[in-house]
Amino acid sequence: MTGKPARLGRWVVLLFVALVAGVPGEPPNAAGARGVIGDAQCRGDSAGVVSVPGVLVPFYLGMTSMGVCMIAHVYQICQRALAAGSA
């Protein structure tokens, strides 16, 4: 695969990796980490604790998949429109 779709695919993968990886050197569950808004922290006991990567990775996978599909459809529509216009 060469050209613009391959370049776009590389950018999508790079964006996905950047979103999943998070901030380099960020300690998990540290004060001031993501998931804490101001001084509000959830200190109550919960029935089940779900890790942030356990929630975010499937979310980002789904969003990336949907974005790639939408871009592919728009690309095909534009190709067909340009082909019909030049014929």
Curated annotation (Swiss-Prot):
Its main location: virion. Keywords: Disulfide bond, Host Golgi apparatus, Host membrane, Membrane, Signal, Transmembrane, Transmembrane helix, Viral envelope protein, Virion. Residues 26-51 are virion surface. The chain crosses the membrane at residues 52-72. Coiled coil: none annotated. Residues 73-87 are intravirion. The keyword Cell membrane does not apply. It is a single-pass type I membrane protein. It comes from the Viruses. It is found in: Virion membrane; Host membrane; Host Golgi apparatus, Host trans-Golgi network. Residues 1-25 form the signal peptide. One of its GO terms (cellular component) is membrane. Belongs to the herpesviridae glycoprotein N family. Envelope glycoprotein necessary for proper maturation of gM and modulation of its membrane fusion activity. Also plays a critical role in virion morphogenesis. Interacts (via N-terminus) with gM (via N-terminus). The gM-gN heterodimer forms the gCII complex. This is Envelope glycoprotein N. The gene is gN.
